[in-house]
Each structure stands twice: as structure tokens, then as C-alpha cells.
């Protein structure tokens, strides 16, 4: 039994915890350089160890960080597989990922070890959708080819048959993954006169379908055979690895284009390169690659592709917003509450 003074002291501690008063400054290790404004705020709030040189950690350095930190802030370049996570120290309680995708983290092993995982959803949506739409335009209209002609001094003047591309207005766009980003892509594409088709685990709410005038395809194979442009906007999970397999790529029209701003592993990159080289697909716009930072050498030689170095969400605004979400997740954890963006294995 607690005496009256002890009960009062206990109640005060509980109220303080519920009000969000920090119990302490957790030791936070950040694996990559973040925007200055984000790092400044993190130093104010936490015992923060930064990476000012922005050199990716080796696997040994990453394991050492897991052993030392109470909170680890990794990015997509850090491979936190089960072998790494089982070596985490007893004080590690939170992996606050700087990014929406968590396919580089073994979330289930983290859960088994009592380590929460959070991400930064929502704040990358519009910027990634912008880049997707840019690629949807750039590939059929041969924009990069045209820029190279100018830079190489090969432009000799306009002619009626010069640099002819393909019209996108009125074409069918097939979106694979109709989450936040997929829907944002659909809104942009609809404004450009594209017909919206999509494949998802389940149909989106009817109000969204009506707004986008979108057609749902339960069968991915059937949709791929009928659309003119495919946009990959689904996460990489064990179920979506090589979702666009050689067989499915061959089911597409030879005049079709494919755009990927999601994860490279969703497409069989070798099969895609072979088909583009053989003229079995019209072109591709890729911001992500199966073995980043390596890119299939065949893709680098092709004229009918636009390749970008994983910059779909790369705006200053999105990076600051992502940092703010990381800070909120850490601060909420430090205050003894459930982080708002916690990733549950069943969600993946």
C-alpha cells in the first residue's frame, strides 16, 4: 500500500508522463545528413549523433549504431535486415525511419525484439506524383533526347518529321497501387486527358473512383494488356517483388510505356532492359532501380528511356517535412506514448 504522500507523488509522475513531459533526452543516431533546420531541432531536443559527411555507414558501423542508440534514424540506403537487428543493444527502442518505404527494415524481427518502427507517410505524396507525371510526359515526348540534341550541337532547325514522339492525351494510364501517391498521380493524369485505370488489392472508395473517373481491374494481367502507359506506385514487399515479371511485361502492348517511381524491385529489371532493347516495349521512365545505386548497363545505352537517380521526393520542402515527422515520432516515444506513424508488420 502507498502512503498518501507516495500516492500523490505517483499521480504527479503519471500526469507528467501523460502531458508529454520528456522523461529524458534519448540517444539518437542519424545515419545520413539531413537538412540543417532538421538537424538543429534534433540537437535541441535529443542527445543526437549526426553524420555531417553524409557518407553511408558500412554494415559494421550500422550494427555498432544499433548496439549504441536508443533511437536510430536510418534511410533507404541502410540495410536493417534480421541479421543486423538481432545485434541491437538492449537500449534500442525505436527505429524512426526517414522515409515512407520500410522495405530495407525487417519490421517483424524488430517487433520480436521489442523495437518500434516508424516512417514518414503522406509528406512525399505530391512531390513523388509530380515526378511520376514528369516521366509520363518525358518518355513519350522524347524530352531528354531533345535536350541531348541541343547540348550536342546537333539541332539544325525545325522540320515536320523532326523528333516525333507520341501523344498522351486520350491514352489509357494503368496505375499499379492506388494509395496516396497513386491517387495523386491519377489526379494529375486526368487533368492531362488520360483515361485512368488501376489495379489495387481492393477498389478505392466509390467517391474517389467517381472523382477520378477510374476503372478498377482486379486482374493485373488483364489491365496490363489494355493500357498504354503503366505507372508503378505500390510499395516493395515480398508479395510485390518482381510483380512486373518477364511474363507480365510481355503481356503489355509493344507500343506501351512503363514508369516507376516506387521501388526498383517491383520490376524484373533484366527482363525490362531486354524488352526495351528489342523494341518489345516503347519506352520507360525509371527513378528507381533493382540494385541501387547500380543500374543495368543496357538501360544506360538506350535512347527510349529516361533515367533519374532516385529523386522522386527530392524537394527541400519534402525533406524538411519528413524530418519533422521523424522528430514528432521520436518526441512522442520519449514522452512515453505510442508514435503516430508506427509501422505494423501486418500492414506490409
Outline where the language-model segments fall.
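N-terminal glycine-/charge-rich "phosphate-binding" loop or analogous flexible N-terminal tail
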Residues: 1-3, 7-71, 193, 197, ...
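Short, well-ordered coil/turn residues at beta-beta hairpins
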Residues: 31, 75, 98, 233-236, ...
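Phosphate-binding beta-alpha-beta segment of Rossmann-like dinucleotide-binding domains, i.e.
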Residues: 113, 121-172, 184-187, 191, ...
